[in-house]
Amino acid sequence: MLERLQQLLPPPADPVEPGRPDGWPAVERRLGTPLPTDFKAFTERYGSGTVDDFLYLFNPFVAGEDGNLLVETDRVLAGYRQTRARFPDRLPLPAFPEPGGVLPLGRTDNGDELYWVTEGDPDDWPVALLASRAALQELHRMPVTGFLAALAANHLASRILPHDLLGRPSHQFTPSAEP
């Protein structure tokens, strides 16, 4: 799937904070779970940055706190748990590390949040998208690179993402250390 994504959304020639294969064991120990292979390959090839200056995936190799997968996991899940305790009908999925719990993956400029749903093999984790301004959530049963490739090919159906993002004639990845 990464090959298809690279055709649709060319990676940067000089990625920002791409990490290395030998850095993942420490990240996975800290999180307490293996991460999807495609996400690791994406991070190593693309590094940090945004898709269309709108969508940012967290990266455990970011030097600062903002956008760092490890820091954002703690922050985002704390807020998720509080909101879920008050509005369990809006957030039916548990928070990681509960089985099938959500694990933060990224966010949009609109404040929408992307999560993995940690059910089964990490390479099979679907992507969940939660709207920031409405009680909407979507489950996309595909890996993160499949989600990005579907977005870049204009084949992603979403009631949460803006229509002008979904229908662009082309998409761009911009390397950046800041989300």
Language-model regions: role of each:
Residues 126-132:
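Catalytic Cys-His active-site segments of thiol-dependent hydrolases/isopeptidases
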Residues 137-158:
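Compact, glycine/acidic-enriched structural inserts
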Residues 106-107, 118, 131:
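Pocket-edge structural micro-motifs
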Residues 104, 133-136:
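Short, glycine/charged-rich beta-strand-loop motifs at protein surfaces that mediate ligand recognition
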Residues 101, 123-126:
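A short pocket-lining beta-strand/turn micro-motif at the edge of beta-sheets
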Residues 1-110, 160-163, 167, 173-179:
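A surface-exposed partner-binding patch
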Residues 113-119:
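Short, surface-exposed beta-strand/loop micro-motifs that present aromatic residues
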Residues 110, 121-122:
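Short strand-connecting beta-turns/loops that link adjacent beta-strands
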